[in-house]
Curated annotation (Swiss-Prot):
PANTHER family xref list: MALATE DEHYDROGENASE
GO molecular function, one term: hydroxyphenylpyruvate reductase activity
Pfam assignment, any one: Ldh_1_N
Source species of the chain: Sus scrofa (Pig)
Main location: cytoplasm
Record PTM Omega-N-methylarginine, positions in chain: 230
Signal peptide: none
Subcellular localization, as worded in the UniProt entry: Cytoplasm, Cytosol
Lineage: Eukaryota, Metazoa, Chordata, Craniata, Vertebrata
Residues binding NAD(+): 11-17, 42, 105, 112, 129-131
Name of the protein: Malate dehydrogenase, cytoplasmic
NCBIfam families: MalateDH-SF1, MDH_euk_cyt, PRK05442.1
Gene from which this protein is expressed: MDH1
Amino acid sequence: MSEPIRVLVTGAAGQIAYSLLYSIGNGSVFGKDQPIILVLLDITPMMGVLDGVLMELQDCALPLLKDVIATDKEEIAFKDLDVAILVGSMPRRDGMERKDLLKANVKIFKCQGAALDKYAKKSVKVIVVGNPANTNCLTASKSAPSIPKENFSCLTRLDHNRAKAQIALKLGVTSDDVKNVIIWGNHSSTQYPDVNHAKVKLQAKEVGVYEAVKDDSWLKGEFITTVQQRGAAVIKARKLSSAMSAAKAICDHVRDIWFGTPEGEFVSMGIISDGNSYGVPDDLLYSFPVTIKDKTWKIVEGLPINDFSREKMDLTAKELAEEKETAFEFLSSA
């Protein structure tokens, strides 16, 4: 057995965490021979609920869980971390402007970035889930100058998985048969789900998605809006936001960081845009296609971008630049 790793989940009393913690504890994310010390952080009013989650994790009797720590204190939560999964954020309330939401979250992620900087290992991998995820991730990274910015990523894997699933449903295959879809940009309704480079396995051979679907207007229209608005559709139907699918996407994202991506496949995650070859301005936290090896991501370079894609990629970059500007105004005054 290897040494235990310390894994933090914030917002640990919430519903995404409730769907996520069992998978982390049972070895589905870090492997079946990796012991874990699981740290659960939430705000003080949630400590009663968190106690219940702690009891349930104990009652799961998971052999890999060496210890579970529930706390509302950052100095305990962020100490010596190997992995931080930042799920907790201020949710958008009725009548709340996006700007107000940004302001509330800048405060949270500035504090958590500073706590990572002060207490966590410098090699910590930080995954931001709480929305607005891209800008929250950038805020945390800026507030943790001693941790390499490449160690920060935000979740767009849920969008990626949604795009895969839509193509699979359209063609009557399993999601597993679809690979190399891309989510460009922001985890918001301006994101651009791109299948120009995606492949699908049909009758044992790989075919381009455009060739397989044979319906360009669907791929350039309804497919894109369905993926962009899927989160809202789930809320409308379930009266709660996506939790099971979000937790599954977090597992996929973190497992790929830990073990790497399969040969010939790439995945989507929000990462720092510095030095990309796709004309996205530097210093944005933007979702790109990446391959991962030795816990290090690399942007997939050299994919041809048509005019349709260019316009959509620029639009979501513009939104991210505006979010960043608003967030940084708050950051300097926070």
